[in-house]
């Protein structure tokens, strides 16, 4: 199934979380896995929910992803997702897989669920075994609730080098009923996904089947999470999970439903919002960079070039230094394998046109430097070849990125 519709009427819910949709609860506790803050969390649904997930394309998929895939393979439904930090349980062999299955079993037993209704996720250092004694005790401490405090307890439990919690929530109307989509995510470094993203957990009370939900998630992932980059590194643990309780009471959604576009847009906005928050919170970052490309041969080529630009270390450092060195943007376009006419390209940084028809344009260095001091920097490119459009998000590259990653384990 291919889904491409991307328009609809939605409203942002400023204080919305993963527990705002009907039927969801969350919790987070400090199980003493390493840090003094929460390090074990759960999202629980009142009913078995339609579910879908997308995963990292890394050859070294972590054990929790394999367990989640096994759970979803049974009937494509989930009722809980259990998450830990700061151990990724990746590259841990047979013992790591056994531990991930035990996490699933412990969660199912704690909340009275079927084993295959539990997803497992982990984030943190690769190559370390889970401290299972602490996890066994920690899961028993989880008491899910529906308050903002409960949602934030979960959100805290999934963070590693993140400096802020990432949450988003949007509402729309379907069959005259309010339908809500909420989400929580983590990610700051090792961000260059190719399928999903770091970790993201999406909840909704929409009535939608798992196959339709999966098709929508894959389509939306390609224009949201897959279009962000912080450092060009892809994690072993990247995963996006979405659960739909169906408790909003709408008629079952399909792409032919008259209100389908409303649901699709609410889901897309939630994912895009979380993706941009992840990009903005890149390790050591001070600015969000948004690159908009139009006039490409296809949307795919536009997305590819946008991500190429936002992922260029030379572009990222120029933005950090507030240096309007548009030649670095051209450099990134030039080594893309997308179709480019080098004699007719436009480049703008914010409101200032730097290049038009591949000819340099006069601009004020002072105004450009002032613009580049802003928290959000927009770069626009027009290739004048076709109708393809694409957007990508990233962040500047600072001295602090090196400091954070040089001492990550110590």
Curated annotation (Swiss-Prot):
Keywords, alphabetical: Acyltransferase, Amino-acid biosynthesis, Arginine biosynthesis, Autocatalytic cleavage, Cytoplasm, Multifunctional enzyme, Transferase
One cellular component (GO) term of this entry: cytoplasm
Pfam families assigned to the protein according to its UniProt record, in alphabetical order: ArgJ (PF01960)
Thermal characteristics: Optimum temperature is 75 degrees Celsius (OATase activity).
Keyword Transmembrane helix set for record: no
GO biological process: L-arginine biosynthetic process; ornithine biosynthetic process
Pathway linked to the protein: Amino-acid biosynthesis; L-arginine biosynthesis; L-ornithine and N-acetyl-L-glutamate from L-glutamate and N(2)-acetyl-L-ornithine (cyclic): step 1/1; Amino-acid biosynthesis; L-arginine biosynthesis; N(2)-acetyl-L-ornithine from L-glutamate: step 1/4
Active-site residues per Swiss-Prot or TrEMBL entry: 197 (nucleophile)
Task of the protein: Catalyzes two activities which are involved in the cyclic version of arginine biosynthesis: the synthesis of N-acetylglutamate from glutamate and acetyl-CoA as the acetyl donor, and of ornithine by transacetylation between N(2)-acetylornithine and glutamate.
Similarity comment text for this entry: Belongs to the ArgJ family.
PANTHER family the UniProt entry points to: ARGININE BIOSYNTHESIS BIFUNCTIONAL PROTEIN ARGJ (PTHR23100), ARGININE BIOSYNTHESIS BIFUNCTIONAL PROTEIN ARGJ, MITOCHONDRIAL (PTHR23100:SF0)
Miscellaneous section: Independently synthesized alpha and beta subunits do not reconstitute a functional protein. Self-catalyzed precursor cleavage is a necessary step to form an active enzyme, probably by directing appropriate folding and/or topological organization of the active site.
The protein's name in its UniProt record: Arginine biosynthesis bifunctional protein ArgJ
Organism: Geobacillus stearothermophilus (Bacillus stearothermophilus)
Lineage, highest ranks first: Bacteria, Bacillati, Bacillota, Bacilli, Bacillales
């Amino acid at each position: 199934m291919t889904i491409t519709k991307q328009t609809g009427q939605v409203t942002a819910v400023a204080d919305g979380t993963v527990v705002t949709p009907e039927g969801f609860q969350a919790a987070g506790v400090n199980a003493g896995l390493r840090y003094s803050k929460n390090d074990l969390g759960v999202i629980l649904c009142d009913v078995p929910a339609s579910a879908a997930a997308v995963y990292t394309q890394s050859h070294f998929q972590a054990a929790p992803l394999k367990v989640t895939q096994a759970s979803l393979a049974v009937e494509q439904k989930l009722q809980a997702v259990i998450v830990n930090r700061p151990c990724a349980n990746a590259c841990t062999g047979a013992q790591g897989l056994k531990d991930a299955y035990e996490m699933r079993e412990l969660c199912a037993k704690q909340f009275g669920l079927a084993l295959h209704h539990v997803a497992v996720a982990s984030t943190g250092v690769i190559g370390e075994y889970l401290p299972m004694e602490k996890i066994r005790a920690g899961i028993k401490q989880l008491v899910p609730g529906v308050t903002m405090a409960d949602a934030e307890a979960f959100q805290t439990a999934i963070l590693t080098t993140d400096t802020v919690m990432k949450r988003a929530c949007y509402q729309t109307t379907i069959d005259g009923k309010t339908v809500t989509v909420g989400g929580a995510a983590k990610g700051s470094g090792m961000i260059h996904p190719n399928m999903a993203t770091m970790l993201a957990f999406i909840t909704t009370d929409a009535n939608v089947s798992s196959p339709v939900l999966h098709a929508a998630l894959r389509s939306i992932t390609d224009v949201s999470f897959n279009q962000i980059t912080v450092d060009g590194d892809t994690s072993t643990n990247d995963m996006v999970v979405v659960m739909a309780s169906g408790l909003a009471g709408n008629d079952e959604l399909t792409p032919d439903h008259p209100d389908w576009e409303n649901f699709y847009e609410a889901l897309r906005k939630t994912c895009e919002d979380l993706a941009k928050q992840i990009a903005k919170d890149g390790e050591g970052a001070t600015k969000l960079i948004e690159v908009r490309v139009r006039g490409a041969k296809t949307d795919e080529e536009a997305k590819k070039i946008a991500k190429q630009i936002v992922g260029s270390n030379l572009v990222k450092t120029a933005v950090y230094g507030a240096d309007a060195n548009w030649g670095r943007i051209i450099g990134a376009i030039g080594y893309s394998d997308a179709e480019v006419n080098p004699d007719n390209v436009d480049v703008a940084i914010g409101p200032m046109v730097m290049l038009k028809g591949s000819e340099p344009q006069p601009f004020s260095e002072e105004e450009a430097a002032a613009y580049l001091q802003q928290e959000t920097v927009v770069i626009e490119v027009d290739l004048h070849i076709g109708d393809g459009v694409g957007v990508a998000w990233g962040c500047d590259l600072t001295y602090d990125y090196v400091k954070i990653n040089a001492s990550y384990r110590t």
